[in-house]
Amino acid sequence: MRTVVWQSLSETQQDAILERPAITEGANITAAVAEVIAKVRAEGDAALFELTEKFDRIKPESIRVTEQEIEEASARLTAKMKQALEQAYANIAKFHNAQKPTPIKVETQPGVVCEQVTRPIQKVGLYIPGGSAPLPSTVLMLGVPAQIAGCRKVVLCSPPPIADEILYVAKLCNIDEVYNVGGGQAVAAMAYGTESVTKVDKIFGPGNAYVTEAKRQVSNDFRGAAIDMPAGPSEVLVIADETADADFIAADLLSQAEHGPDSQVVLVTPSVLIADQVTDAVQKQLKQLSRASIAEKALASSLIIIADSLTQAVSISNYYGPEHLIVQTKNPRELLPLLDNAGSIFLGDWSPESAGDYASGTNHVLPTYGYTRTYSSLGLADFSKRMTVQELSAEGLKNLAPTVVTMAEAEGLDAHKRAVTIRVEKLTARS
């Protein structure tokens, strides 16, 4: 890990060390994904079978996972695993249930009533990556809010073979359809539909560069589907003072570093002693990890920043805007009102990032790459949409008419003006 003293750097140097690595889409990825999308749109299920065999080296008997297969997968899980998944489900459901919006109804002036109502997005698609380890936690983070929001149709795609844990959580979340398909072809299938896969309105979930690019492309096509948020490498920033536990900090940094070689890992502290202790602790703990080689690559570009105060540490964090922000200080809650840009915040020694990743109740689908300045943690609102309603009485329109007419005249929109005056004239004729 590289250690730098913030005050010793010029403004240009400060910007440079906090700059994230470029997300390399590359013309080859863009073109390859466009080709996959076009093929799925043209050939439907046949393309899904062909591409699954090509990329996943598996020839599934069926694209859709049957109810029987889901039941059999559930039966194979241990009681311990089921209990863990069910507790995580309960906590996530409790937190997301609390996010249900309150209807708004306001009389802005006599006879003019304005409302805001919320409706679920009707059809949503959930993408769950494959890889060496199953990600049932991601199914929970996407499936639970979709269930609570009341989405009419929830579709899940994941590369085959789909892990038993994923299928069990799909059952917990009452997901309607599960498909043995991954990669850009899964995104295309959900965005445009095939003979088997339902076309959805919005697609959620992480993935590799090809999945990310496929989501970008379908979201830019009005015939495609909306997506949850832009994606980039995973990140953690830790703010720590001299009271922090160096072993805890090291464990948190490594839990992020093991995600991948492009993971962003940053410690900001006013304590040189803590910086040194964390450096030593990271090296000791690294040797115990099964994914040490991956974590080591991430650590090669990681940072320890020596700030002159906690106030400056907060300022650095707000500028960087991390996906995960861990605060290990004497009074962490005192800093919370000062923290503006972060996907999810973990306060105090006993709040590891892992808790939020799996089971505390918050959502682990978070903005990265500095998007925390404008994007939020995934939540119930992302599976819903707002509509406004207005209802004017005759007297309400009569009282509001002069304002609307004056503004319509100023904008030169005669038909807008006439839509009001024609009504006022009829009211006048009746009286």
Curated annotation (Swiss-Prot):
Tell me which Gene Ontology terms the entry assigns under biological process. L-histidine biosynthetic process
Say which domain of life the source belongs to.
Bacteria
Q: Which NCBIfam families match?
A: hisD
Q: In which pathway does it act?
A: Amino-acid biosynthesis; L-histidine biosynthesis; L-histidine from 5-phospho-alpha-D-ribose 1-diphosphate: step 9/9
Q: What class of enzyme is it?
A: oxidoreductase
Q: Could you tell me which species this protein originates from?
A: Vibrio vulnificus (strain YJ016)
Which keywords has UniProt assigned to this entry?
A: Amino-acid biosynthesis, Histidine biosynthesis, Metal-binding, NAD, Oxidoreductase, Zinc
Where are the catalytic residues? E323, H324
Protein name (Swiss-Prot/TrEMBL): Histidinol dehydrogenase
